[in-house]
Amino acid sequence: LSGGQAQRVAIARAIADHPKVLLADEPMSAVDVAARTQILASFAAIRSGEPDMALIMVSHDLGVVQHIADRIMVLHDGCVEECGLTETVLHHPTSDYTKRLLDAASL
């Protein structure tokens, strides 16, 4: 299996039992652009088809976070820098660290 296919299989296995919480740790790592698009579509389908399932995603990719998350928590050195609605945090950050991250990511 390719990296993207393996990621999709892992996602399918994880949701097969309809857990209340799904933890995805860097689900876009080591996948190409096409696989990334398919994985994002899988998570979007989970969000719409499993309204009682909470998806907690760890990601360094703010572009992914922007498309998937309702809420975001920015961590720095193991501490919470900022937490809130994704739209608010990404467009009106209060933390200097968050502002630097967003500038670096060109969001």
Can you name each region flagged by the protein language model?
Residues 37-51:
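Helical segment within the ABC ATPase nucleotide-binding domain
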Residues 18:
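Conserved catalytic motifs of ABC-family nucleotide-binding domains
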Residues 71, 83:
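Short, glycine/charged-rich "phosphate-handling" switch motifs in NTP-dependent
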Residues 65-67:
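A short, surface-exposed alpha-helical micro-motif characterized by mixed small hydrophobic
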Residues 11, 23, 39:
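Hydrophobic anchor residue at the start of the ABC signature
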